[in-house]
Amino acid sequence: MTDSACSRRKIVARDRLHLEELIKDAIEKGGPECDLNFIDVSNIMDMFGLFDYSSFNGNISEWDVSNVTDMGQMFHRSAFTGDISRWNVSKVCSMSGMFYDSAFNGDVSQWDVSSVQDMRGLFSGTPFNGDISQWNVANVEIMSGMFASSVFNGDIGNWDVSHVKDMSYMFVDSKFDGDISHWNVESLLDVRNMFRESEFERSGKSRLWLNRVYQEFLDRSKDSNGRVIALNRDRLENLIDAAMFLNGPKCDLNFIDVSQVKMMFDLFKNSPFDGDISQWDVSNVECMDNMFTDSLFSGNIDAWNVSRVESMYEMFDGSVLEKLGKVPGWYKE
């Protein structure tokens, strides 16, 4: 089909709602492969979910997106495969799920992503396998699920990931098997299931890489007196994951100072942990809901000070402690 069906003079999109109306009208008149370059989007800052679940696969190569800050889920589960290689994305802060489960496999090698902080799920479930080796990801903090279930196996070994805190599920079920041995992971907190069922795991590389990451994490979690302090539930969960990975499910976790943690809900839910936490100072904990639900934990925690706990809902339901009749005497649902 010719472009004439929806080609016209430039129309400035006043705001996000106006942009959506222009796109809808153009597609209705010209079909999903029409040319949308007649729309001036230079005033638009928010493009979150703009083509979410869309059949659009036309031309937006000339769009001026230089003021856009949010491209999260922009092409989420869409049919789009067009050329956006020349886009100026230098102000974009979020690309969360931008191409999630989409058909996109285009060239984005020259994109300036230096302002992006959130790349979670960016290429998850896509056929994308392009060159992004030169991307400046120095400001990215979240990469969870970034390449999950994708075919990506490009070179990202020189990326500066020193500010990334979350890489959980990053390569789960992916084809990635590259060299990331030189990554600086000084800020990394969460690597849960990072390589699960991936080629990286099957190649045997994940154990060595995670061993280094977890050990570094524990080392930098120590204070000046050598104590490992958990400031909150999330940090505590990360410390537990690290200790169990390095030392197994029967490890001693009494080295973790939990005196500042207030929330412990679901902490060992469905967990294989069966080590020692008898010396934990839980005197400031307020919620222990489902803490050991369906867990294998069978240790002695009778001496815990739970005087400030307000809720213990189903704390031991389905647990080994319940089955053995060893639920602590202080437990009150």
Predicted features by range, described:
Residues 1-333:
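Negatively charged
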